[in-house]
Regions:
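Accessory carbohydrate-binding/adhesion or oligomerization-edge regions at the termini
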Residues: 1-107, 192, 542, 549, ...
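Extended substrate-binding grooves/exosites of carbohydrate-active enzymes
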Residues: 2-41, 201, 316-626, 630-651
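Beta-strand-rich binding/interaction modules
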Residues: 157-159, 242-277, 625-629, 633-656, ...
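Accessory beta-strand-rich segments of carbohydrate-active enzymes
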Residues: 2-24, 33, 38-42, 56-60, ...
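Extended acidic/polar, glycine-enriched regions
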Residues: 183-186, 250-330, 682-718
């Protein structure tokens, strides 16, 4: 970095891209270190002192308003506010500076006319944080180092009134030597944290613009002989059968010291040991390790490397440990391979996010995410768009996830729209800051086997600065490949990336690339944009995996909604998004793109992901099931097949069978005791179930399923024996053995009683031709285009009924017309033909010159006591025509209140496809039953208009109805992106075609 003329902090540093690190110690690996072997075995180091917990803090709107005396004097400490570290200041004290969300635009856009590298002198929230700590004599006799794991966005460090140093970069560690300034007894640490600095121009990620000490703060005590940095590599030879352990040790105080290195397996057995005299700062030790098991996400085999340092007297000064995974990642014949096998990423992008604490991660949350990802067959994570906390990589090593580790660089707002001050581009004044961010990530994370690619950042255009970063990665670590998507936008330096990476590229365009004899394999670094009710058409992407070897998967955008849990004015909990805190400019709910909600509730999108990412395929047949193990390395062992056999919606038999071992890439047919399949519609469903707890997954976890449907439902013949109609002046009534129906001559069915004679309908049904707009609808304009269907649904006049009587049946025919379309009518027919049921038929004649239809159906407003839903169709979770690969046919139940998925912005949700029968009843089983062929059904408390008008689920209060929507079809939901991509034609329904469907209503 640039030579600093003055070594005491000046506010001008905040706007100087060449000043980003002052008096920091060099970057190093994140290995663990201990004073003794006993400490190492207990994983409790006396050489690390946590400073997490209660701190005192002072807020100022900008640096000029922050008193310097707070840095040097303890006089006011007791008057300051207490905060808990780690924290985001916007979550800990929102009255200081409320949360603010923007996507690509910089948060100061429109407030101040700033250009890179300028920083506001008016708005730059500055928080001075104070922590007192005590040190013992043995501690101060060692080198005392302050370790800041993550501070956003810039930090100035003072200890005991002395200025120590300054650092930028919110997501990699900063270390400062405190040795000259600390003493025995009480010491005072002051951190002044700035929300904005030149680094903020490179931290324009699509996330909440927090500031804070969001990772742990600790003191490290380095003994006289200290392993400062450890590098481990594991090259494989002889067709990946021989492994070598290569280590590089950088040791402080190495003179006349020794290092003893030991490699042990999971059981503690020693596989290798060596001793190395240390005479220089840098030493190398290598050895071939026979018989090791290789690391992969399928089989995350880890070994423990222990390095014991001794001084000239032979005394142990330090014990260091790191996990080692033997694996080799490389490009072979233009295909990325792990341990010689073509790899396919079934990945997600994952922001570090907690709805209660912002970017503060806890062990429990990390474990939950990894467990849920593994249960969804996710095998890879892109750390969008910054290095994660170190523990995340350790857990990925242990439980098996591949990682693209991404540098904390995004400058989207500087080039969209394009400016003449795009950063970093080819600007020499930004080059060192770019390299420093990549170097800090690589040096900390280099020993984690889970990391397969280094990423130069995200959406930062292109240019020489990023190219030089990619070259640095290659020089320092030839064992991994380099990723950067920005080359797709700016191809001046195509060699910045080793893989061709795109965002939101359509399937047809991807195929064009793959058919062009490309030089690089293809991955989607972001695809199937999961904003709200989305991920439609995802199966078209995963279908490319078997078709094109150079298609190597992708990473869903993204894992978790970035929604903050707050109390709404009505007292309900709310998951808040941009604009909810008065934060402007904002991009509203555009950061709620997760397959799970902000509180980590899973959605129907997870059902689809779990199925499409499965690596074990189950194909039932008349005698059993064929199981295909598509894993690359792992023999399928320790699983059961749970199966069910149904005929005409009735259970016939079920069981659970031990699955024999199946080698990678092999198949086996498992005979199951079905007997002769009965006539009718026979459904065989098989589930792959984990027999015992394995890794992070609990026993009973279902990882895959397969289903086959044989034959067709036997139709019961029902004689026409309808009760005689009671034809009045205004209404027509029917009273049968299990039927009580009243139809208005104008308006349709107005009364439908259950078998106890209680009313089920609140009002006559309405046409259902539109839906509450999804986020994708709003993005592609479908919310506007569907206006004509809202008009027909809600503003049509219903004609007087045409009553048609035949022997044993009566039909009332209604025509729905609107003045805006004088020559057009939708016809609805109610036919009573038995003592306990009536048929409803909807005829759509076709309407030319109109957009695709969102839906075709009828909406019934039922008595709110009817809340229990039991459905035979595809489930168990919501599904749509373009997102139902992961659903299976069967009986599924839910409560009407849960029929609406609580997306941050209420929208169309809760649909079930392929429905044959659905009942909506009270607790005693009385209510309404609907049956038909291949219906689509939703049951929830809210009308589309109510969902459309609500900004949050908490706005929907006091439901007075249960809404049963019965449709012939619903348009797909789409998901290629959420800002213009249409629903694909094969999942749409042209309005100019005629459609007819019928269903039966029955009282229960």
């Amino acid at each position: 970095m640039k030579q600093i003329a003055r070594e005491r902090f000046e506010t001008a540093w905040l706007s100087n891209p060449e000043i980003f690190s002052v008096h920091e110690l060099p970057d190093c690996s994140d290995h663990a270190f201990y004073a003794t072997m006993a400490e190492a075995d207990a994983d409790a180091s006396s050489l690390v002192k946590s400073l997490d917990g209660a701190w005192k803090a002072h807020f100022a709107m900008n640096p000029s308003e922050a008193p310097d005396t707070l840095l040097t004097s303890a006089a006011l400490d007791e008057t300051l506010r207490e905060i808990q570290v780690p924290c985001e200041f916007q979550m800990e004290a929102p009255e200081w500076d409320p949360p603010h969300y923007v996507n690509t635009q910089y948060p100061w856009d429109g407030h101040e006319a700033l250009q890179a590298p300028q920083v506001s002198e008016v708005y730059n929230p500055t928080v001075t944080c104070i922590r007192h700590f005590a040190l013992s004599l043995p501690q101060v006799q060692q080198r005392t180092v302050l370790h800041l794991a993550g501070v956003e966005a810039a930090v100035l460090v003072y200890v005991n009134g002395h200025e120590v140093g300054y650092a930028e970069d919110s997501f990699t560690p900063h270390r400062f030597d405190l040795t000259p300034y600390v003493h025995v007894g009480e010491n005072r640490l002051a951190l002044r944290v700035f929300k904005r600095c030149t680094g903020s121009w490179m931290e324009d990620q699509d996330f909440w613009r927090f500031s804070g000490i969001h990772r742990s703060v600790s003191l490290h005590f380095y003994p006289e002989t200290h392993l400062y940095d450890l590098r481990v590599r594991t090259p494989l030879t002889d067709n990946y059968t021989r492994a070598t352990l290569e280590t590089r040790l950088r040791v402080m105080g190495a003179s006349l010291s020794k290092a003893k290195l030991t490699l042990t397996d999971k059981a503690g057995k020693t596989l290798w040991a060596a001793e190395k005299p240390l005479t220089a700062l840098e030493s190398y030790v290598s050895a071939e390790i026979p018989g090791v098991k290789l690391w992969s996400a399928e089989e995350p085999n880890l070994y423990t490397l222990t390095v014991v340092l001794t001084n000239a007297q032979g005394q142990v000064t330090e014990v260091c440990r790191t996990k080692v995974g033997f694996r080799q990642f490389e490009m072979k014949d233009k295909i990325m391979c792990l341990n010689g096998k073509r790899i396919v990423f079934h990945g997600v992008n994952r922001h570090e996010f907690d709805c209660d604490r912002g970017r503060v991660m806890t062990h429990g949350l990390l474990m939950r995410d990894i467990r849920d990802m593994k249960a969804m067959n996710i095998n890879a994570v892109r750390t969008c768009h910054y290095p994660n906390t170190s523990e995340f990589y350790r857990l990925c090593d242990e439980y098996g996830l591949y990682v693209i580790d991404e540098a904390n660089i995004e400058t989207h707002g500087s080039w969209q729209p394009m400016h003449d001050w795009v950063v970093p581009d080819n600007r020499p004044e930004w080059q060192e800051a770019v390299l420093a961010r990549g170097r800090a990530m690589l040096e900390r994370d280099k020993n984690h086997p889970c990391i397969l690619l280094w990423s130069c950042g995200n959406e930062s255009w292109g240019g020489k600065d990023l190219y030089e970063l990619s070259q640095y990665y290659r020089r320092e670590d030839p064992t991994r490949l380099v990723h950067y998507e920005g080359v797709a936008n700016d191809p001046r330096y195509p060699d910045t990336t080793d893989v061709h990476s795109n965002m939101y590229r359509r399937v047809a365009s991807i195929e064009e690339y793959l058919q062009s004899n490309p030089d690089k394999p293809f991955i989607n670094c972001e695809y199937t944009h999961a904003m709200g009710n989305s991920c439609g058409g995802m199966s078209l992407y995963t279908a490319l995996e078997d078709k094109y070897p150079m298609y190597q998967g992708g990473f869903i955008w993204d894992y978790v909604d970035q929604a903050l849990r707050v109390k709404a004015p009505n007292g309900q909990e709310r998951l808040a998004y941009g604009g909810d805190f008065g934060d402007k400019p904002t991009d509203w709910q555009f950061n709620t793109n997760g397959i799970i909600l902000g509180d980590r509730t899973q959605t129907g999108k997870c059902q689809e992901v779990r199925y499409l990412f499965r690596d074990v395929f189950l194909t039932p047949d008349e005698t059993g099931v064929t199981v295909k193990n598509r894993r690359l390395f792992q023999t399928l062992t320790g699983y059961d097949v749970r199966w069910t056999l149904e005929c005409d919606r009735k259970p016939i038999s079920a069981g659970e069978t031990l699955l024999p071992d199946i080698a990678p890439g092999e198949s086996a047919h498992i005979d199951l005791p079905f007997g002769t399949l009965p006539e009718g519609q026979t459904v065989v469903t098989c589930f792959l179930v984990l027999r015992e707890k394995t890794g992070i997954l609990e026993a009973g976890t279902v990882l895959s399923h397969g289903q086959t449907v044989f034959g067709a439902m036997k139709k019961a013949e029902t004689p026409d024996n309808a009760p005689a109609p009671v034809i009045g002046d205004c209404n027509v009534g029917f009273r049968g053995e299990g039927l009580g129906v009243l139809l208005a001559r104008r308006g349709g069915i107005i009364s439908f009683r259950d078998r106890l004679g209680r009313e089920t309908l609140l009002r006559a049904p309405q046409l259902s031709l539109f839906r509450a707009s999804t986020d994708n609808d709003r993005g592609n304009g479908n919310n506007i285009r569907q206006g004509v269907y809202h008009l027909i649904s809600r503003h049509s006049a219903c004609s007087d009924a045409d009553i048609q009587q035949e022997a044993g049946r009566t039909t009332l025919v209604y025509r729905y017309t609107t003045p805006m379309l004088p020559d057009f009518a939708v016809t609805v027919r109610y036919t009573v033909h038995s003592q306990d049921a009536l048929d409803v038929t909807v005829d759509w004649p076709g309407l030319p010159n109109q957009p695709d239809m969102p839906a075709l159906g009828l909406s019934f407003q039922l008595d709110p006591r009817l809340t229990r839903v039991r459905c035979y169709g595809y489930g168990p979770d919501e599904n749509y025509i373009d997102r139902r690969e992961g659903a299976y046919l069967g009986w599924h139940s839910w409560n009407a209140a849960d029929g609406m998925t609580r997306y941050c912005k209420p929208q169309e949700s809760g649909n079930r496809t392929g429905v044959q029968v659905v009942s909506v009843t009270d607790a005693d089983g009385h209510g309404v039953e609907i049956s038909g062929d291949n219906l689509e059904v939703s049951v929830q408390p809210w009308l589309p208009e109510e969902l459309e008008a609500a900004y949050h689920p908490s706005d929907l209060m006091g439901s007075v109805r249960t809404v049963l929507d019965v449709a012939m079809f619903r348009k797909g939901i789409g998901g290629d992106d959420s800002w213009g991509a249409p629903v694909l034609p094969q999942f749409c329904y042209p309005a100019d075609k005629p459609y007819t469907f019928t269903f039966t209503m029955k009282a229960l």
